[in-house]
Regions:
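Catalytic core of soluble alpha/beta enzymes
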Residues: 181, 185-250
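Conserved, mostly hydrophobic/aromatic
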Residues: 32, 44, 114, 127, ...
Length: 250
């Protein structure tokens, strides 16, 4: 049992939407396939992964560093203790060979896309959905239900409040009872108007969360918090840069 190839393709997201920071018309994403020599149900097992749509594709790092470290490692060094499957933790260690600990940047995006594909391949080799495999690994009963919400409410050219309301209504029609919208990409007054429009649309049968995508400084974050506290919001997310420690401590 071994990994025989790791393939990556970088594709444009090419969407006119934006949040408080990111213009997705300029954004790319990496799609990764981890190819194994294992065959299940007559098909070769391939695990798939992709990076966050808020980060650029990382094909360069994947091909220059991380792909070869996995392919050049001995197959046995990448397997679990039972020898019947690949081990994501050992593969992660192989990827991080000769890498300095710590760091905040593109490396984590490249490693994460491969890591996702590795876990997908591992579950397919085991013949189980990943959530059940993870529970089995911890000796726990898998919960078939998980909390989910619909994230949307992006900004895009020509999107007015009626379009925003229709978008949020579409999530409710699909069974979601928690929705999230972007803030911080417009003025406080405009965002307040947008929030009120969504709350009016979803009524008391659903809940609304808001996400600033790390846009605010402390003063702006507090100004928004004072505005938001009058509304029954589920949460107020990511107010500032995660590396702005003074803001996070305030």
């Amino acid at each position: 049992m071994r990994i025989v190839d790791i393939c990556e393709v970088t594709k444009p997201i090419a969407s006119p939407i934006r949040n408080a920071y990111i213009d997705f018309s300029k954004m790319t994403a990496s799609l990764v396939a981890v190819v194994t020599d294992v065959v299940r149900d007559g098909r070769r097992v391939v695990g798939y992964g992709f990076n966050s749509n808020g980060r650029y594709g990382q094909g360069g790092l994947i091909r220059e560093r991380f792909r070869d470290r996995i392919l050049e490692a001995s197959p046995q060094s990448l397997m679990n203790e039972q020898g019947d499957n690949i081990c994501p933790h050992k593969i992660w260690s192989a990827m991080m060979t000769n890498e300095k600990p710590g760091g905040h940047g593109e490396r984590s995006v490249a490693v994460g896309a491969i890591d996702m594909a590795v876990w997908d391949a591992m579950a397919k080799i085991a013949g189980k959905p990943l959530f059940r495999l993870l529970a089995d690994m911890e000796g726990r009963e898998a919960n078939p239900k998980v909390f989910v919400y619909a994230a949307g409410g992006y900004y895009y050219p020509g999107k007015d409040d009626s379009a925003l309301r229709a978008e949020m209504r579409s999530y409710l029609d699909r069974g979601y009872n928690v929705v999230k919208m972007k803030i911080g990409g417009a003025s406080l007054a405009d965002d307040q108007r947008r929030i009120e429009a969504v709350l009016k649309e979803i009524g008391s049968g659903a809940q609304l969360a808001v996400d600033a995508n790390g846009r605010f400084d402390l003063e702006t974050a507090i100004a928004y918090a004072k505005m938001l506290r009058q509304y029954p919001l589920f949460w107020y997310e990511e107010i500032g840069d995660p590396l702005d420690y003074s803001l996070q401590a305030a």
